[in-house]
Amino acid sequence: MANDLFADAAGGRLGAQAPLPQRVRPQALDEFAGQRDVIGEGSALQRAIAEDRVGSMIFYGPPGTGKTTLARIVAHTTRAHFEELSAVQVGIADVRRVLSESEQRLGQTGQKTILFLDEIHRFNKAQQDALLPGVESGLVTLIGATTENPYFEVNSALLSRCQLFELQPLDRDDLAGVVRRGETELATTLPDEIRDEIVAAAGGDARNALNILEAAVAAAGGEPIS
């Protein structure tokens, strides 16, 4: 797996100082909130992850719906080498490096490579084209994540080689479960009406809900939140 990939996913070296969404990020499918149509028991994606046979795919949806979390759950379960890049921070040289290393690794050890590219819509056409040969040949399995409509932001040739999964904003019950998970991490229990207010304010975004919770607990300074 990519070096230090899960420092973020598990709260990392910051430990209790890491932001709450990082500290409570699900590590397995049975901890994942929402998206039952995509990842529910018996779904094609659930079976593919469980059987370690994921293909190239793109997760598309609003912030806080679980795109990065799903990719990292794949990373926790796969025997493949997992590489994570942010399209905001890398370019063609980085893509070519990953493809070259993937080819060497496959030839030397037989280990396949999964490349998670966050914010894939930030790659321009030339950068996306650089990915295409590796995806087309099966040298890498691509997992892309985007908040933008991939039919407009991802090259048609690349998109045609990926399965598209659209993630929806979390419903109130799922968000309430996320908030309760945060409460456990923060060793606090909210009144139901306060939890409901956080859920309503979060707008279907799990990360937003946890950030609101963390800010509220910090502002209370150890006093009960009311």
Task: Indicate where each model-derived feature is located.
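A short, basic N-terminal segment
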Residues: 1-51
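Walker A/P-loop
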Residues: 2-13, 47-85, 100-103, 132-137
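Short glycine-rich substrate-engagement loop in P-loop NTPases that contacts/grips substrate
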Residues: 38-43, 80-114, 125
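Conserved catalytic/switch belt of AAA+ P-loop NTPases
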Residues: 46-50, 117, 121-160
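A short hydrophobic beta-strand->loop->alpha-helix junction that borders the nucleotide-binding pocket
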Residues: 61-62, 83-91, 146-147, 167
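Conserved AAA+ ATPase "SRH/arginine-finger" region at the nucleotide-binding site
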Residues: 86-88, 163-176
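Helix-loop-helix "sensor" segment of P-loop NTPases
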Residues: 176-195
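C-terminal helical "lid" of AAA+/P-loop NTPase domains
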Residues: 195-201, 207-221
